[in-house]
């Protein structure tokens, strides 16, 4: 079925071609891929200015616009080349260009900033864009985020803190920017590229395309977040690791250990955001799949004095001299407890592990092992072939 051709006035195409295409060097003008990039710039100008100031003009996508330009200036198309083939090659080339951007988190680390494209069917995603020639990744991320949100992350960005994925053979790296106030004013610097900028609760965003969480909690289908979905699970892993280094009860983990618990104001006041700090201490930057620390299954103690009494009792029972350990083989274990610090939590009588705040030694000997003896006759029978 033949598609309807977009009608753009010749005067408009003349102006756009003179602005963006005809002035480029001849060696670039002979390269159809390079011409397509210039046509893309002309298309943005057409949407930003002509569409806004000239009623009645046809709104069109980049493919239809490029066809109109090649039809208006056929000398731009290499001899014998098909327009559709050139556009397909250009699309494939663009997919190989890395994209850089940022994941902006609020002060509670519960919400993330997403942007929505200008077109009606556009979904929500993180602010990012393609890198320019000889542009550093972090500079590209700062430029794209500023263009799409009006917020400058140059003073917040850390070159080593990012999540990096390869999606359909295209590299995408998002730098993590935590601690941005929710009342920050965002305003896109480009026309007709970003329609909306909003904070979203991370726990309400989908981890995969069949995750119906946003449908039930936001009233939005999961495909509205298809650009953000690949980064949600790595982001949750990052949050788990961020608050998983403490061994106390306020360690930021939920009871399951699979998703981070909501950080409290008190906790965040203790956590200073140092953007030069390595946020992936146990893996390389951008390593998004992390193994969660398993919370210790420990027997609760009602108060400090209860634990202290227990430890004192243990020390009274196990006062052993290093040279007389043989006299105590009937006991189950040997505890070498530092007597000067009762704040160190040790293993109690039933063998249930608890957290240890200091350096504790646990020389342990099994009763079965200590009474073990080789059966010499049985061994010799085996060797007697």
UniProtKB/Swiss-Prot annotation:
The organism's place on the tree of life at top rank: Eukaryota
Subcellular location(s) of the protein: Cytoplasm, P-body; Nucleus
EC number of the protein: 3.6.1.62
Stretches assigned to coiled coil: none
GO MF terms, alphabetically ordered: 5'-(N(7)-methylguanosine 5'-triphospho)-[mRNA] hydrolase activity; manganese ion binding; RNA binding
Name by which UniProt lists this protein: m7GpppN-mRNA hydrolase
Phosphoserine modification, residue list: 246-247, 249, 276, 284
Domain Nudix hydrolase: 95-226
